Amino acid sequence: MREGIEQAAADVIARERLTVTLAEQTLIVDEILNDMFGVGPIEPLLADERVTDILVNGPDQVYVERAGKLELTPLKFRDNAHVINVAQRIAAAVGRRVDESSPMVDARLADGSRVNVVLPPIAIRGASISIRKFAKRNITLARMAQQGNLSQAMVEVLKIASACRLNIVISGGTGSGKTTLLNALSHFIDSHERIVTIEDAAELQLQQPHVVSLETRPENSEGLGGVSQRDLVRNALRMRPDRIILGETRGPEAFDVLQAMNTGHDGSMTTIHANTPRDAITRLESMVMMANGNLPLVSIRRQIASAVHMILQIERMRDGVRRVTRVTEIAGMEGDVVITQDLFAFRYDASAFQEQVHGMFESSSLRPAFAQRAAYYGLEGALLGALQP
């Protein structure tokens, strides 16, 4: 195909007697191929491993995120119709439709990158394409520790938590690195376990051999055929999973996830949008109420306290670095309040305000609530040793 386009371009250049360098001719061919089979002018950004997000705001603005910071690129589309054409091709590749009657869609590229599209008139200044790139290199907690995302002691505690089959919720804001942390944490799951993953858009990269990946499906234009996360969680319980991993809990499926965690599916994991561990608990309460508004609040809190063992708070800080700022245990109930305790927290140095955030990951040195569980797995000594400052 490329050879044919190169020859056609050479013929046009010769016929029109144009002065074009070899580099310019190669660029023209690349642009044609990207328009025909790729994502137009932003195709080179998909190959750039430093880029984590690509944000198209109409034909004249293409931003990227590199090293946690947004940058405006010189890339442009020809016009708004060009942006829409690329967006529709992305949606069509996964069997979805985006047009004026259905102006918003979530999709993914062939490499797994997550895509959100919004078309006019909803997008007032031109079609919007937001791409969260799929990491090509599998990141581990050890590597995250080397990058300063968390400490080595935290890695050891999380390794023990996974071995002890703790149910873990990863909490953070948009773009904070929740899915990356979930992927890294999943490396500690035993290779002999059967894992069922549930996602709106497939992003998880589990390395174990026995993984069943399920993905939701939106309703068709007649409002039929939709498969929700709640449907998939309920079905997963019939699939004999050792662990259930839900890419993100965002609605009434929270009720079913807690039920699963409380009925023998220990070691399950999910993520949630929240700014603190306490906020994560409050959000879980609200989402359970979406499923069953008749449950008393204290009953919901008891379910959370018995189902969720640990909350990891991750944050993209002002220097662009994503850090696990809290490792928080749920230690039970006192009255009608869920009790938590921090095992680790990131303490930043407020006296040294610079572009780079300075601070350290500190252990609270508290005895973990899951120490007895760790003893059952023969890991209590290692756990207490990892928590020593």
Regions found by a protein language model. Give the residues of each.
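Conserved P-loop NTPase nucleotide-binding/switch module
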Residues: 199-212, 236-335
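P-loop NTP-binding catalytic core
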Residues: 48, 61-164
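NTP-binding/hydrolysis catalytic cores, primarily Walker-type P-loop NTPases
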Residues: 320-389
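Active-site phosphate-binding and catalytic loops of NTP-dependent enzymes
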Residues: 16-21, 37-48, 90-107, 193, ...
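Conserved lysine of the Walker
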Residues: 178
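N-terminal anchoring/assembly modules that precede and organize ATP-driven motor systems
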Residues: 1-71
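Hydrophobic anchor at the beta1->P-loop junction of P-loop NTPases
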Residues: 170
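P-loop NTPase switch/communication element
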Residues: 135-146, 163, 183, 187-234, ...
